[in-house]
Amino acid sequence: MKKQNKEGFTLVEVMAVLSISVFMLLISIHPIQNKYNEIAEGIFWKKFDESWMRLVTIVPKNGQKGNVYFYNDKAIFVISNQEKKYLYYPQGLHLYKYQNIQISASGRVKADTVVFNSEVTKLKYIITFQLAWGDYRIKKEKN
């Protein structure tokens, strides 16, 4: 009996091509995820700045007190226990320890420091809240 000559790929060839394709796809996903996490971290810092500036502007204007509570998964911006804004940390950004930053009715902030560690950028962010008019600085150090 003569074997018919059929055109097409064998099962082994198809499996080899699919395996290589899946492997290449998996290799490319990891850098994309890292880039996404870096962007999410940048967005977090912009939102943090916006929320902080809003808080130190509204508090003295209304003569109310304000607080920023730094928890393990989020920062909460509070104006006189009435208005709260939740800002969740992006994946890979971790708070060193719980902190509470108080803003007086006149808008003054006492000096304090909050520390974050980033698994994504491999940096330590040291936020130093300065005396007086609600200013802060972020210092970045290599982990």
Feature locations, PLM:
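N-terminal helix-rich module
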Residues: 34, 57, 61, 65, ...
